[in-house]
């Protein structure tokens, strides 16, 4: 299907380097998507949309996989991923819009996922099959046809969002086997086709600095992230012959969103090694909104510690202090793997709620002290 589409041609992204696979297309989370003027959708009554995706992450506002939608007029259809790994299907009938989500099965990060959306015009419902499981079904009444807008079809981008806005809705990961069929396949066939033969294949992503080697405007000597987004370098310490420093990172796109802890290490403070993310937010955990700024030290027992701001919009107040330390300092001298304490170590006391972050911790006279910025 993608052979009929054009890739975003914006010259602002002319230095992008796109990984290649024979069987799949890569979407970098901000500059790569595909589009075409649509015509065949106008005649579609019953149909099936099918694709396989291996996402690496999802932005806080969600990312589109398929979108031919005008939300102002409630026309068209969109299939999106939400930040909590659900598949969202939006149906527009013209003046009326219905939305439903995956329930029984959601998508996995870094693995192949098979998704099928089956619109049953005569029966009056829409099936959502995720990884061979009927994850949800929406009923809406028989013989209701989707009203398609006169908009292009986008693959990997939300049609309603400008590519330059802070929340871009651009898919990040691999995608393959995209099909749009002008018939509603049986649920048995959809499940049979979703065996996930390659579901055990881990699909890894490694940030790539090489695309910027010839960029005269990019610093070559000073510390800088391998790609996309960086702010607030913090938590420097020396341990086992290495200097460590961390920073606020977003591997999805060059915007402040879905903030995690990037990590660099060096023996001489000149030549730095990119390391995996030290901290990543987790759905359903105390830091699901983001792992924000903090500090680091080597404690009185000689163990490195990270103190960071745990953001969680489902809590009130929504900011608190969390703690993490390396999993194994002997087997992992570069401290690539960190484990979080199971509970928060400091929550906000009575006062102005909602601004309680950036803990700075130090040792003085054999005691630990902490300063926290607040409003």
Regions inferred by a protein language model and the residue ranges of each:
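Beta-rich carbohydrate-recognition and catalytic domains
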Residues: 188-375
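Extracellular glycan-associated modules
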Residues: 1-205, 210
